[in-house]
Curated annotation (Swiss-Prot):
Its EC number is 3.6.1.73. GO terms for biological process: nucleotide metabolic process; thiamine metabolic process. GO terms for molecular function: ITPase activity; metal ion binding; nucleotide binding; ribonucleoside triphosphate phosphatase activity. Its cofactor is Mg(2+); Mn(2+). Phosphatase that hydrolyzes non-canonical purine nucleotides such as XTP and ITP to their respective diphosphate derivatives. Probably excludes non-canonical purines from DNA/RNA precursor pool, thus preventing their incorporation into DNA/RNA and avoiding chromosomal lesions. Mg(2+) binds at residues 38, 68. Homodimer. Substrate binds at residues 8-13, 68-69. This is Inosine/xanthosine triphosphatase. Disulfide bonds: none annotated.
């Protein structure tokens, strides 16, 4: 059984990681441990590189705390231009897989508050009245009328980031 450390306590991220690992390695093939670790970047990262650095830092910090695991996984959400997206970073002892998620264009009224220094989650919670929306459907769920959620978009990116771990060509 694979021991997988999720460098997050966010239920949407954990759900995406668990589902993707089960789809790739088989149902019941993984035990998931969830831990809170620092990203080393601002609460609301801006740009692809800062966001990717946050995910990489979370993986490194998770590895330091739980070095006996088989996989360490982090998902870091960020703002790039007028959109929100995330980076997924997965490592085992010998390699790394990374993938960027789909992007969601954000309305100007939301972007204005984020650019003033607020994190997207709290801005969206105020806008929607949904407490801790970032731990639930997120802006993605709201602006896609529930057709997608944070977890569903993260899930795709986790599947992509897992590609090097089950394909010999890598």
């Amino acid at each position: 059984m694979h021991q997988v450390v999720c460098a997050t306590t966010n239920p949407a991220k954990i759900q995406a990681i668990l589902q993707a690992f089960h789809e790739i390695f088989g149902e019941g093939s993984c035990h998931i441990a969830s831990i809170a670790v620092e990203s080393g970047v601002p609460e609301q990262p801006f740009g692809s590189e800062e966001t990717r650095a946050g995910a990489r830092n979370r993986v490194a910090n998770a590895r330091r705390l739980l070095p006996e695991a088989d996989f360490w996984v982090a998902i870091e959400a960020g703002i790039d231009g007028d959109s929100t997206f995330s980076w997924v970073v997965i490592e085992n002892t010998t390699q790394r897989g990374e993938a960027r998620s789909a992007t969601l264009p954000l309305p100007a009224v939301i972007l204005e508050k984020v650019r003033e220094g607020e994190a997207l989650g709290p801005v969206m919670s105020r806008y929607t009245g949904i407490d801790e929306i970032g731990r639930k459907e997120g802006a993605i769920g709201v602006f896609t009328a529930g057709k997608l959620t944070r977890a569903s978009v993260y899930h795709q990116a986790v599947i992509l980031a897992l590609s090097p771990f089950h394909n010999a060509v890598y």
